[in-house]
């Protein structure tokens, strides 16, 4: 469980780094590198990586951008049957439920989502 938590935390940190955000000690405001405050207006799409295909993901991200959301919150492993039920492309996240053996196809979709989100 600790490995999952650490992996999820690392994923969140990488997402923040991709945004070029600045966090200052003792300051509750997150800043954009180019200046100004960053408003964390998040939508929860917990099973985004697990349920949607690429076309649906692009549609979802476009819709969230139109509505002004700045953050999409999702989980890497679905809470309900996330290790046993494949994603939209038939990939399970782990080989034999072993957290040291990831399935590349499953995580390639996450790379796609991050790239697409970065375009918006």
Q: Which positions does each model-derived feature cover?
A:
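Boundary at the C-terminal end of the N-terminal hydrophobic targeting segment
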Residues: 16-18
């Amino acid at each position: 469980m600790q490995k999952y938590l650490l992996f999820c935390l690392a994923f969140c940190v990488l997402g923040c780094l991709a945004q070029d955000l600045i966090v200052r000690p003792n300051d509750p405001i997150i800043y954009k590198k180019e200046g100004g405050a960053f408003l964390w207006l998040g939508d929860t799409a917990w099973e985004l990586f697990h349920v949607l295909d690429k076309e649906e993901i692009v549609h979802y991200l476009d819709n969230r951008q139109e509505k002004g959301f700045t953050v999409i919150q999702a989980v890497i492993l679905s809470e309900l049957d996330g290790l046993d039920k494949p994603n939209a492309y038939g990939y399970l996240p782990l080989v034999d439920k072993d957290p040291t053996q990831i399935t590349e196809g499953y995580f390639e979709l996450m790379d796609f989502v991050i790239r697409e989100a970065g375009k918006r």
